[in-house]
């Protein structure tokens, strides 16, 4: 029925929103790690310690 199709579409849409948010959060964490590694290679160890201690 149309109502069931609407529910499935709404559920799929919500699933994509959640996935998008999760991927966004993972991206932020990856960037923090990348920044920490850059700082480490420069030799600024304090920035690495601050970024790694969540």
Curated annotation (Swiss-Prot):
Residues 11-30 are annotated as: N-terminal region. A synonymy between H.magnifica and R.crispa is controversial. One of its GO terms (cellular component) is extracellular region. Residues 3-12 are annotated as: Plays an important role in the hemolytic activity. InterPro entries: Anemon_actinoporin-like, Cytolysin/lectin. Its main location: secreted. Pore-forming protein that forms cations-selective hydrophilic pores of around 1 nm and causes cytolysis. Pore formation is a multi-step process that involves specific recognition of membrane sphingomyelin (but neither cholesterol nor phosphatidylcholine) using aromatic rich region and adjacent phosphocholine (POC) binding site, firm binding to the membrane (mainly driven by hydrophobic interactions) accompanied by the transfer of the N-terminal region to the lipid-water interface and finally pore formation after oligomerization of monomers. It holds the Pfam family Anemone_cytotox. Belongs to the actinoporin family. Sea anemone subfamily. Keywords: Cytolysis, Ion transport, Membrane, Nematocyst, Secreted, Target cell membrane, Target membrane, Toxin, Transmembrane, Transport. Composed of a long N-terminal alpha-helix and a core region rich in beta-sheet structures. Before the pore formation, the alpha-helix binds the lipid membrane, partitions into the lipid-water interface and stabilizes the monomeric molecule on the membrane. Finally, it traverses the bilayer, thus forming the transmembrane pore. Octamer or nonamer in membranes. Monomer in the soluble state. This is Hemolytic toxin. GO terms for molecular function: channel activity; toxin activity. It is found in: Secreted; Nematocyst; Target cell membrane. One of its GO terms (biological process) is monoatomic cation transport.
């Amino acid at each position: 029925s149309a109502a069931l199709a609407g529910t499935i579409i709404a559920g799929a849409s919500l699933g994509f929103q959640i996935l998008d948010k999760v991927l966004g959060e993972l991206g932020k964490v990856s960037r923090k790690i990348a920044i920490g590694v850059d700082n480490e290679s420069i030799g600024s160890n304090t920035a690495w310690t601050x970024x790694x201690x969540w």
